[in-house]
């Protein structure tokens, strides 16, 4: 967490300024980038609370309200990040596989609608948990935990619905979408002659896939086993200890995405879809969009 805070704060501050100053702020990709950068910046600014919590032997001293706010934002960052990764993947999929449709949609209201939908889904997952009651628990040795070590009653009454929704919308749906669109994108990109545009496209694909596999997948798999353990499907004491330790490690690992994401924002991503559209049109002599391609080519050349 300390490493993420040291590296992530200046990186996200620079990225946030860069994204807010870009001329194409209304473009779909930039809308998702900007939201992702805001989420990461807020998340990193709250990391000192978690750092202090772990350095004092997992003893929360900031009170219940601070526990709810920081805990809710911490876990909300997980779902918002993977949600906007999914939006970026869909955006790149449209740009690669359906470029003409993409050009009609990228300046329309659909990026804003998707962004609002992601925030609403995250709020529907996290807010009931935050407002459902205290999230700090006084344990032995006068130690207070935050967002962990809940009683069996709290787990069944409050955390089962939360975890089911988190696993569906924070894991199954996003990873299914990413797993489907990436092969389709890679197949289409493979048909394009080697150029800087192809390189940029592959970098975007590779970055999102790498961060998803390194940061998000281990946590969600561990979270699934932790969920099964709390429902007593896994009862062996040795297995429970391993799952608990792995969950701590993967929670720290998932925070790495907040200091890695600024690298994504600076990948040149403005013009490579032009090459894809021109390739699709000019490869087909009977292309019914020839007039559209000619206009688009002239526009791209002049710009």
State each model region's role:
Residues 1-3, 25-88, 95-108:
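Extracellular TM2-ECL1-early TM3 structural module of rhodopsin-like
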Residues 3-6, 35-38, 48, 66-69, ...:
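Hydrophobic residues within alpha-helical transmembrane segments
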Residues 45, 124-131, 172-179, 209-228, ...:
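Hydrophobic alpha-helical segments of membrane proteins
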Residues 54-79, 98, 103-104, 109-115, ...:
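Loop architecture of class A 7-transmembrane GPCRs
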Residues 138-139, 143, 233-237, 270-303:
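Intrinsically disordered regulatory tails of 7TM GPCRs
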Residues 142-171, 183-222, 232, 239-243, ...:
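Intracellular effector-coupling site of seven-transmembrane GPCRs
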């Amino acid at each position: 967490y300390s490493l993420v805070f040291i590296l992530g704060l200046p990186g996200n501050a620079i990225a946030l300024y860069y994204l807010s100053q870009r001329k194409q702020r209304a473009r779909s990709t930039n809308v998702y980038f900007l939201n992702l950068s805001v989420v990461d910046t807020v998340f990193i600014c709250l990391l000192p609370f978690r750092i202090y919590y772990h350095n004092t032997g997992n003893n929360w001293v900031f009170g219940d309200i601070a526990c709810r706010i920081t805990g809710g934002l911490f876990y909300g960052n997980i779902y918002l990040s993977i949600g906007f990764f999914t939006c970026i993947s869909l955006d790149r999929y449209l740009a690669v596989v359906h470029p003409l449709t993409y050009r009609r949609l990228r300046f329309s209201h659909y990026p804003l609608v998707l962004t609002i939908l992601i925030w609403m889904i995250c709020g529907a997952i996290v807010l009931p948990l935050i407002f459902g009651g205290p999230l700090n628990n006084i344990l032995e040795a006068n130690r207070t935990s935050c967002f962990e070590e809940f009683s069996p009653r709290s787990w069944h009454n409050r955390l089962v619905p939360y975890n089911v929704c988190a696993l569906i919308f924070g894991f199954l749906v996003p990873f299914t979408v990413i797993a489907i669109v990436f092969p389709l994108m890679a197949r289409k990109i493979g048909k394009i002659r080697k150029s800087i545009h192809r390189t940029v496209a592959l970098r975007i694909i590779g970055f999102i896939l790498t961060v998803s596999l390194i940061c998000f997948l281990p946590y969600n798999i561990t979270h699934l086993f932790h969920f099964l353990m709390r429902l007593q499907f896994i009862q062996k004491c040795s297995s429970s200890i391993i799952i608990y330790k792995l969950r701590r490690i993967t929670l720290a690992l998932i925070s790495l995405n907040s200091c890695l994401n600024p690298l994504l924002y600076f990948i040149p991503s403005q013009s490579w879809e032009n090459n894809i559209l021109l390739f699709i049109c000019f490869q087909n002599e009977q292309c019914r969009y020839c007039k559209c391609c000619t206009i688009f080519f002239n526009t791209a050349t002049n710009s």
